[in-house]
């Protein structure tokens, strides 16, 4: 327990001088007791001085304050005591419900599991959302990215996934709110409470108003809690909203530490920082971590270095499209842009694969015909193309679905659709079973039987 003094404060960066024989190691947690502030060592500058990032606001700090070295990295509570609680980056409760009362604490900087410990089995995870289960199925223990610009529904989709999977699979979830709105964190808490799944979710928040050091580490705090559940042999869902803010916090920290920026102003260590987080999100032979990460796409540009770096680590990508959202189709998932490593006949079965490919083929053909329709009208198309267009429009409408978490907005009850019903419905549309039904009957329904019922009512 060596002590040092603050020698320089530049925003969130604090330089601390220690005796030459007691210099803290990289990632050691230091504490300014008088301010109740934790610092994390990022660089050793020489001469006994270390450069640190503050985990809270540095307002009111001054030179000469005493700093104590804890001798180890930041540690957070883990285990069942964290369920139903909201914590900050340091694992302190922020829900006004008293102490966590944990039995054990883990440090947030840990090694990823070794290759021989990792699990290689493939098992599908049913989500109850038609478009996802059909076109970009999730693997249990896989990594999923929800890509989308501002306001296309990343957070709502994520909340629906938590709701469906927590109810259908009764697994444990860890939710890391990284640099998002405090209001969304509040909504999420009450949504989980009302759904009755709060006792299965641990929440860690480092919101928009927090300093960059806090936002950079909060994802690791959540992941550490998820790893503990996995090591106990449980299947865990790890949700991160939003992974882009994690990158952005890294950019801010990098600039404050004086590193030279790389492409588009991002930190030069972007790929490495992303890898450190993503490599730890993996399943072992004892338990699984299935992760769903919302990825904000700046200016709807998927080639931006941040989303592009994230792509490399994912098993499935769910791309949310502004064009589809503008048509009033929610979830606004683009079935042509979204991909999954699991969409393979050897994994999902031949029927599922054929139906998914058929849906994509019909939608792609409709996309190609749109220009002709816009210029010449529908009458100029061949009979075969007219049928394709009619079916594609039905498929587009049928890809929409009322969500449980959006009932207050849509006014219609949420629907969970099993994979079997999803395949049956789309197969029927492709084979022309429902050519006689109006396309509006397919909009915002659950199973295909509801669409038929809706059409018959009219």
UniProtKB/Swiss-Prot annotation:
Domain of life: Bacteria
One Pfam family this sequence matches: ATP-synt_ab
Catalysed conversion reaction: ATP + H2O + 4 H(+)(in) = ADP + phosphate + 5 H(+)(out)
Annotated protein name in UniProt: ATP synthase subunit beta
Function: Produces ATP from ADP in the presence of a proton gradient across the membrane. The catalytic sites are hosted primarily by the beta subunits.
Amino acids binding ATP: 148-155
Main location: membrane
Homology family: Belongs to the ATPase alpha/beta chains family.
Subunit structure: F-type ATPases have 2 components, CF(1) - the catalytic core - and CF(0) - the membrane proton channel. CF(1) has five subunits: alpha(3), beta(3), gamma(1), delta(1), epsilon(1). CF(0) has three main subunits: a(1), b(2) and c(9-12). The alpha and beta chains form an alternating ring which encloses part of the gamma chain. CF(1) is attached to CF(0) by a central stalk formed by the gamma and epsilon chains, while a peripheral stalk is formed by the delta and b chains.
An example Gene Ontology CC term for this record: proton-transporting ATP synthase complex
NCBIfam families according to UniProt: atpD
Its EC number(s): 7.1.2.2
Key words, A-Z: ATP synthesis, ATP-binding, Cell inner membrane, Cell membrane, CF(1), Hydrogen ion transport, Ion transport, Membrane, Nucleotide-binding, Translocase, Transport
GO molecular function term, any single one: ATP binding
Keyword Ion transport: yes
Membrane topology term: Peripheral membrane protein
Localization: Cell inner membrane
Protein species of origin: Shewanella halifaxensis (strain HAW-EB4)
